[in-house]
Amino acid sequence: MAEFEDTTVFNFGSQKPENVRSMLKLVYEALEEKGYNPINQIVGYLISGDPAYIPRLNDARNLIRRFERDEIVEELVKDYLSDHKTDQKK
C-alpha cells in the first residue's frame, strides 16, 4: 500500500505563462530567435488558426495554443485601446 501514498507531480514545463501578455512575449522571442518576423507570424496564426506559423522552439507553439485565439485578440485590442486612451489625455 505504501506505493500509493506518494503524490505524483505532473510538470507542464518550466515556462507557464500566467496571462496572454507573458505568453506573447515568450512566443515573440522564440520567433525572433528563429529569424522570423514575429508580427507577421503571430498575425498569420491568429487569422488562420494554423499552429505551423509558430515554431516549436522554447515550446512556443504549445504556449500560444493554451489560449483561444479570440482571447489573444481581445487582450491585444484592450492593450491597444488603453494605450490609445492614455495618449489622448496628454
From Swiss-Prot:
It comes from the Bacteria. Transmembrane segments: none annotated. Belongs to the UPF0297 family. PANTHER family: UPF0297 PROTEIN YRZL. This is UPF0297 protein OEOE_1166.
